[in-house]
């Protein structure tokens, strides 16, 4: 994985975490709603979209993929400091790079 791909996966993973928090859904539900083709499109657009705010891009993704509000809350009951959506995105992008076979990164993102 080259540096651009690392940055793209970091961005998309952080975006998924951001959307999950905003809509109170599990990350897996967000990934399922977007689908493999949608993830590939987000990766393709990541270099441009990272110049926009997460709020704007997430609003567009939520509307386009018709992601509904859920009731999953991972934040309010925590006793410790909560990692930011960027921290979680970085963690997931590292896991994808470490675990995925070459050419199967999108499938790995969907599994994680």
Model-assigned labels for residue ranges:
Residues 11-18, 90-94:
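A general alpha-helix detector
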Residues 14-62:
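N-terminal interaction modules that seed assembly of large macromolecular complexes
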Residues 40, 60-71, 94-101:
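Amphipathic alpha-helical interaction surfaces
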Residues 77-112:
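A charged, amphipathic interaction segment
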